[in-house]
């Protein structure tokens, strides 16, 4: 029922005993629960490739439900066989030289007597340059230059938008749409009302019958801008509908080219599921083929070479991190947990697609570990464990003492220890980054998370179908967004003092909305499979219960409308120009939401690693780009 957040739930003792019970008391209780004869070490079994539910009788005679998920697709031998030469110093040295040359391009644009620009193109050149380095995944090297360029553009921004240059007589759609999008993404206060200026006398966005390449590119940037909508911005919704239709029609008319591929990519992934490293990989292909780029007075060949080098240099780091992650997975005893899914490589891929700065290794590995543990817990609480066992496990985890594991069924001991060890380990990493101990904070998040799972396990066991409100509030917790995000972001070189942390973690609106979208989107992709496994409660079924006569289609329409509203709310929480919290402090929580959203874009990409999931792993982690 859950995938991989958490808001406080009412405190309750699942054992109807004080959580301060001694280890002796817990051992007395646990004697009534037999073990399964499973150990933490040994060779992994290979589950079926299907997603059906099976039942199995353990050696203690307990009949258990078990999801028949496929096994880990990326075995140790395969990971160890990966090779790369891009970790050699010569590649880093070449990249550093190119970084210096690109900085000179930025600086030349800022010079009064610069050769690259004129008063007739100085605005679009700056915006295009910023947009290009961001889409190519190399913006981290040019933060000061980007700010300087956008400050300049914003100084000429007006309620009528901008033209190509500061001396342009009228604003044009391409410059205004791309400028609006880029400025908004960087926290500048720009109103969507500026787009109304590009409507005709009938209130419709105007276009020509011929659909020239220049116009198509302008509408493409209008579409990209429309996806960064805030709540209540009707013109952005209108722009999205118009531009999506226009671009789909244009694909039927233009020849196969870099432009057509760029349109397909943007229509396919939008913004909320277009993960930065995936976009960089795709844009490298498009950027290298785009003949329009060669007309620019900016040296695009150097931009492209730098993007390729940076992609491959990070690829060499990914190989080392993957090798470490696979060793951790094996040493933790995870392969012996045959009742659950093993998607640690896929989770690492998502992390490396949203945080590919070399120094954020702790974030990538911490996220992959947390999500792996969450998936184990999901399968244990939803299918494999009995209610009595799960109550015992929940109470034992709240004691946060390794001796509490002694009273657990054998298969639960491994789960307890991997959670206990990993949370403690990540807390030590977070303490180095934040300068304070955050373990108690993390423990409370995990306690609330397990309480939400326990609630769902009882619903399954009793066949209770909650109201939508009951389900939704608990489901935002059990979605796992908070527990997957909290500790990993604390390992980063971004300060999270308490007053900032409360604005990105619980009880912030950002955390609530990010958790909501994971719960709602997950339900739209999983509810049928969950129902087949005996997990009736979902936002779809609960909505239908609350609204007698409503069909599944009605429920899905309602949930999808909620998702659209949540997305706009998330945009606002991230980009609100009046917020006291820097975008950099919120961005990774927001991007984790995007990563999970991508996993559910087509179907449940976590239970079954579909073609799109495997392609993402290969294109962003396994295969380098050709220089």
Curated annotation (Swiss-Prot):
Binds 3 Mg(2+) or Mn(2+) ions per subunit. GO terms for cellular component: chloroplast. GO terms for biological process: alpha-pinene biosynthetic process; diterpenoid biosynthetic process; green leaf volatile biosynthetic process; monoterpenoid biosynthetic process. Residues 1-36 form a transit peptide. It is found in: Plastid, Chloroplast. Signal peptide: none annotated. Keywords: Chloroplast, Lyase, Magnesium, Manganese, Metal-binding, Plastid, Transit peptide. Pathway: Terpene metabolism; oleoresin biosynthesis. Its main location: plastid. A motif (DDXXD motif) lies at residues 378-382. Induction: By wounding and insect attack. GO terms for molecular function: lyase activity; magnesium ion binding; pinene synthase activity. It catalyses: (2E)-geranyl diphosphate = (1S,5S)-alpha-pinene + diphosphate; (2E)-geranyl diphosphate = (1S,5S)-beta-pinene + diphosphate. Mg(2+) 2 binds at residues 378, 382. Pfam families: Terpene_synth, Terpene_synth_C. Belongs to the terpene synthase family. Tpsd subfamily. Involved in defensive oleoresin formation in conifers in response to insect attack or other injury. Involved in monoterpene (C10) olefins biosynthesis. A mixture of alpha- and beta-pinene (35:10) is produced by this enzyme. The Asp-Asp-Xaa-Xaa-Asp/Glu (DDXXD/E) motif is important for the catalytic activity, presumably through binding to Mg(2+). This is (-)-alpha-pinene synthase 2, chloroplastic. It comes from Picea sitchensis. The lineage of its organism: Eukaryota, Viridiplantae, Streptophyta, Embryophyta, Tracheophyta.
């Amino acid at each position: 029922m859950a995938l991989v957040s958490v808001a406080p739930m009412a405190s309750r003792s699942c054992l109807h005993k004080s959580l301060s019970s001694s280890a002796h008391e817990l051992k007395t209780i646990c004697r009534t629960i037999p073990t399964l004869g499973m150990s933490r070490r040994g060779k992994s079994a290979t589950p079926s490739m299907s997603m059906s539910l099976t039942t199995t009788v353990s050696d203690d005679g307990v009949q258990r439900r078990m999801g028949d998920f496929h096994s880990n697709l990326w075995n140790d031998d395969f990971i160890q066989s990966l090779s790369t030469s891009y970790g050699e110093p010569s590649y880093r040295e070449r990249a550093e030289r190119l970084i210096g040359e690109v900085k000179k391009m930025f600086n030349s644009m800022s010079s009064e007597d610069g050769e690259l620009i004129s008063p007739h193109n100085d605005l679009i050149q700056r915006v295009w340059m910023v947009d290009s380095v961001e889409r190519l995944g190399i913006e981290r090297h040019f933060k000061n230059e980007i700010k300087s360029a956008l400050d300049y553009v914003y100084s000429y921004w007006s309620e009528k938008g901008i033209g190509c240059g500061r001396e342009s007589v009228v604003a044009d759609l391409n410059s205004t749409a791309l400028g609006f999008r880029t400025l908004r993404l960087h926290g500048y206060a720009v109103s969507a009302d500026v787009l109304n200026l590009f409507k005709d006398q009938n209130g419709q966005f105007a276009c020509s019958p011929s659909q020239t390449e220049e116009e198509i590119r302008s509408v493409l940037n209008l579409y990209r801008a429309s996806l960064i909508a805030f709540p209540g911005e009707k013109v952005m919704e209108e722009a999205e509908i118009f531009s999506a239709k226009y671009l789909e029609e244009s694909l039927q008319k233009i020849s196969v080219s870099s432009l057509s591929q760029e349109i397909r990519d943007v229509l396919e992934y939008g913004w909320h599921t277009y993960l930065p490293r995936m976009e960089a990989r795709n844009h490298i292909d498009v950027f290298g083929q785009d003949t329009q780029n060669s007309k620019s007075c900016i040296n695009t060949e150097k931009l492209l070479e730098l993007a390729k080098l940076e992609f491959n240099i990070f690829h060499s780091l990914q190989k080392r991190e993957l090798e470490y992650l696979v060793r951790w997975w094996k040493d933790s005893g995870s392969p012996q947990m045959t009742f659950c899914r093993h998607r640690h490589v896929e989770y690492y891929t998502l992390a490396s697609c949203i945080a590919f700065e070399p120094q954020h290794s702790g974030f990538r590995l911490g996220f992959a570990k947390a999500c792996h543990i969450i998936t184990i817990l999901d399968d244990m609480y939803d299918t494999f464990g009995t209610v009595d066992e799960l109550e015992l496990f929940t109470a034992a985890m709240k004691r946060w003492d390794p001796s509490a594991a002694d009273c657990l069924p054998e298969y639960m001991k491994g789960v307890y220890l991997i959670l206990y060890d990993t949370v403690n380990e990540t807390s030590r990493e977070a303490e180095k980054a934040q300068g304070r101990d955050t373990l108690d904070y993390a423990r409370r998040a995990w306690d609330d998370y397990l309480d939400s799972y326990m609630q769902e396990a009882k619903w399954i066991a009793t066949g209770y179908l909650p109201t939508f409100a009951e389900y939704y509030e608990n489901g935002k917790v059990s979605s796992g967004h908070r527990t997957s995000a909290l500790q990993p972001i604390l390992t980063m070189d971004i300060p999270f003092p308490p007053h900032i942390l409360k604005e990105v973690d619980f009880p912030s609106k950002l955390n609530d909305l990010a958790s909501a979208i994971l719960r709602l989107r997950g339900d739209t992709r999983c509810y049928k499979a969950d129902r087949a496994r005996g997990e009736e409660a979902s936002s779809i079924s609960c909505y239908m219960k609350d609204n007698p006569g409503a069909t599944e289609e009605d429920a899905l329409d309602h949930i999808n409308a909620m998702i659209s509203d949540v997305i706009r709310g998330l945009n606002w929480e991230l980009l609100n120009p009046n917020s006291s919290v820097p975008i950099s402090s919120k961005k990774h929580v927001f991007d984790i939401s995007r990563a999970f959203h991508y996993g559910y874009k087509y179907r449940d990409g976590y239970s079954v690693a579909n073609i799109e999931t495997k392609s993402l792993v290969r294109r962003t982690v396994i295969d380098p780009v050709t220089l």
